[in-house]
UniProtKB/Swiss-Prot annotation:
It is a multi-pass membrane protein. Keywords: Electron transport, Heme, Iron, Membrane, Metal-binding, Mitochondrion, Mitochondrion inner membrane, Respiratory chain, Transmembrane, Transmembrane helix, Transport, Ubiquinone. Component of the ubiquinol-cytochrome c reductase complex (complex III or cytochrome b-c1 complex) that is part of the mitochondrial respiratory chain. The b-c1 complex mediates electron transfer from ubiquinol to cytochrome c. Contributes to the generation of a proton gradient across the mitochondrial membrane that is then used for ATP synthesis. GO terms for cellular component: mitochondrial inner membrane; respiratory chain complex III. Gene3D superfamilies: Cytochrome Bc1 Complex, Chain C. GO terms for biological process: mitochondrial electron transport, ubiquinol to cytochrome c. This is Cytochrome b. Belongs to the cytochrome b family.
Length: 380
């Protein structure tokens, strides 16, 4: 077996990536989320494939085809709820994975980090288009509002929006193309994940101390395969409790009403995992400014390596920046809450304050805290 594992061209690649891969001996459970994201992606592709066998991407039948899946297809309700809640689990793992990267300074592996940001954008685009497919009220109005934001782009905006819609409003052409893109993007994401791993294995994994771990490596299998397996079991338990007992807890009741272009819901909002960015978008009264802030709320991650002022890589031994980090996490929770609230006092001012705090902590306060810590520790 060892001979095949080390000699066969294809198995050799798998061996170097998942079996004999040298890994730091001290990486914690925060490093489990990469494998959990792979599991989420696999679940989404499989459940999505079975849903696509029964779904019809036509405005007149899309809503009823989803109802048909839940009522008439064998275990269709389970496949549908696994797919819907799988997206939520995917984003929970994504946010924790990115949060780990920020906390432990993994952004210093620039190629891996930038590929991760591209992946984040791709997953967000896929999830947005998937939310449109059931063709409920929130699907239709969410698609209308979010795609309409592109009209803020000077000169080409209106043309671009009509080009994406395939007409003068969100209609049959929009739904069909969103289904096509929603189907193909997960496979593109899978290819990008392999590139992400390729870049990661060029440098090797980071670790909680942020120090070079070349002198103390252990093989990935069996140590981290077993450790990842524990994470997988916990994730699947949470996932199945969510899908079987509380399938609609993270959804919007409005999406159980078929799309009606003549009736606008009182509060148009995206899925919970976009609410923080939606709150930042709404906090700026100007349309173009809001769109730029929305894009920057994610793209600001690309500036992380440039904003790193500390002589230490991780936040493990940096209490001042640690405090800033946890304030940032709390701020993101506030933004998520505000994104789901109506646009009225006091939510408007809270959203604007939280949005300013979000950018200020990342761009100003954390770099300053890093310099202060350098001075305290005489690292200059």
């Amino acid at each position: 077996m060892t001979v095949i594992r080390k000699k066969h061209p294809l198995i050799k690649m798998i061996n170097h990536s998942f079996i004999d891969l040298p890994a730091p001996s001290n990486i914690s459970s925060w490093w489990n989320f990469g494998s959990l994201l792979s599991l989420c992606l696999a679940v989404q592709i499989l459940t999505g494939l079975f849903l696509a066998m029964h779904y019809t991407s036509d405005t007149s039948t899309a809503f009823s085809s989803v109802a048909h899946i839940c009522r008439d297809v064998n275990y269709g309700w389970l496949i549908r709820y696994m797919h819907a809640n799988g997206a939520s689990m995917f984003f929970i793992c994504l946010f924790l994975h990115v949060g780990r990267g920020v906390y432990y300074g993994s952004y210093n592996m620039i190629e891996t980090w930038n590929m991760g940001i591209i992946l984040l954008f791709a997953v967000m685009a896929t999830a947005f288009m998937g939310y449109v497919l059931p063709w409920g009220q929130m699907s239709f109005w969410g698609a209308t509002v979010i795609t309409n934001l592109l009209s803020a782009i000077p000169y080409i905006g209106t043309t671009l929006v009509e080009w994406i819609w395939g007409g003068f409003s969100v209609d049959k052409a929009t739904l069909t193309r969103f289904f096509a893109f929603h189907f193909i993007l997960p496979f593109i994401i899978t290819a990008l994940v392999l590139v992400h791993l390729l870049f990661l294995h060029e440098t090797g994994s980071n670790n909680p101390t942020g120090l070079n771990s070349d002198s103390d490596k252990i093989p990935f299998h069996p140590y981290y395969t077993i450790k990842d397996l524990l994470g997988v079991i916990i994730l699947l338990m949470v996932f199945m409790i969510l899908a079987l007992f509380f399938p609609d807890i993270l959804g919007d009741p409005d999406n159980y009403t078929p799309a009606n272009p003549l009736n606008t819901p009182p509060h148009i909002k995206p899925e919970w995992y976009f609410l923080f960015a939606y709150a930042i978008l709404r906090s700026i009264p100007n349309k173009l400014g809001g769109v730029l802030a929305l894009i920057l709320s994610i793209l600001i991650l690309a500036l992380m390596p440039l904003l790193h002022t500390s002589k230490q890589r991780t936040l493990t031994f940096r209490p001042i920046t640690q405090t800033m980090y946890w304030i940032l996490v709390a701020d993101l929770f506030i933004l998520t809450w505000i994104g789901g609230q109506p646009v009225e006092y006091p939510f408007i001012i809270i959203g604007q304050t939280a949005s300013i705090a979000y950018f200020a902590i990342i761009v100003i306060l954390m770099p300053i805290a890093g310099m202060i810590e350098n001075n305290i520790l005489n690292l200059d």
